[in-house]
Amino acid sequence: MSGFVPSEIFFTRGVGRGETQLESFEAALRDAGIAQFNLSSISSIFPPHAKMVSKEEGLKKLSPGQILFTVLARNTSNELNRMISAAIGYAIPRDKSKWGYLSEHHSFGETEKVAGSFAEKLAAEMLSSTFGSTSQLIYDKEKEEYVLEDKILTTGNISATAVVLSHDEWTTVVAAAVLIVE
């Protein structure tokens, strides 16, 4: 059976502000560089053999109006002084023929580091559960990644955080994994 499997993936984030929730979301997508595409939300599998590329490299391969598959974390508020966060975490196994995981996290009151670390840990736990256990999952501070019996090669995250600055303004944050099918 044949199907299309994304061959590349890039990560991006953005913050937007506007008079309406929709305007702030559009501004966040523009800040992330992906407003000109039709975004289709998918679940959280990092495809086997997919290569991580920079946002700039990924965007060069895309055309305005193109349908893009994304794992999108999004948070929005108009509550004055409210801190909002959105993060995507990823965990990729050493064996590139296996799939990895992407996780989305949306929170209030968390810094970029806290939200990103939570999303990264969640992705690592989801991946380690496919190996049968999360109890042996260890965070290697020196390498800044999660390791499970030498099976996880790479973990990481991207996150965006913002504070609502005005009571008459909406603020939106997005973090996205964009999957490219060639």
Curated annotation (Swiss-Prot):
Catalytic reactions of this protein: L-arginine + H(+) = agmatine + CO2
Gene3D superfamilies: 3.30.60.30, Pyruvoyl-Dependent Histidine Decarboxylase, subunit B
Protein name as catalogued: Pyruvoyl-dependent arginine decarboxylase
Known cofactor(s): pyruvate
BP GO annotations: arginine catabolic process
Record site feature (Cleavage (non-hydrolytic)), residues: 43-44
GO MF entries: arginine decarboxylase activity
Keyword check for Lyase: yes
Cofactor, free-text remark: Binds 1 pyruvoyl group covalently per subunit.
Highest taxon above the source species: Archaea
Source organism of this protein record: Thermoplasma volcanium (strain ATCC 51530 / DSM 4299 / JCM 9571 / NBRC 15438 / GSS1)
EC class name: lyase
Alphabetically ordered keywords of this record: Decarboxylase, Lyase, Pyruvate
Recorded family membership: Belongs to the PdaD family.
EC number: 4.1.1.19
Modified residues (Pyruvic acid (Ser)): 44
